[in-house]
Amino acid sequence: MSEQETAGSLNNSPSGDGGKPLILPVKGVMPTMGNNCFVAPNATIVGDVVMGDECSVWFNTVLRGDVNFIRMGNRVNVQDGAIIHCTYQKTGTTIGNNVSIGHNAIVHGCVIDDNVLVGMGAIVMDNVHVGSNSIIAAGSVVLENTKVESGTIYAGVPAKKLKDISQELIHGEINRIAENYVMYSGWFKDPAPPILPPVGGEGNGEDQIRR
């Protein structure tokens, strides 16, 4: 997809009020995305950000590829209020496939492998490597240089290994959430909903405006 096509696709993301996400180039580098992605109208994506297919970037999120790069695989969902950033001249941020970044989480200058759930409000700091099939529990703080083992749950402040993950949890939680967010994003790509009838059901509605 060309830079012009990408910019158009991002800027034309669906919204109920006609709003558009804030998409900005940094040093001439424009964010790009794959096929069938959704970007909420008040999300912000800037600079050297590359998204794969079927990704979703939700309301009030910020992806700042200004001081370094951000790379996202396929089927990554960045939920409401989350922030993804990187560190100047040190660490970019790389996120694999089938990854969920929970509401208000912060992911900064790290590597997250495939099939990972970063819980709501969690913080993943610079030079962290989160192995595949893992969960970072809600509210956890994963300190710099931590190596999260594959197939584990890390929790706490600072985050430590809590336990190994069963296959049932991988399929029932990590995969389920990623699949659901692909489905949710599809709801916003449907044709615009019909105009609702005026309050009270009569007249042209001009005298029924809620105050």
Residue ranges and their predicted role:
Residues S2-V29, D66, M72-N74, D80-T87, ...:
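Glycine-rich hexapeptide-repeat left-handed beta-helix
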Residues T32-N77, G81-T87:
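A positional/architectural concept
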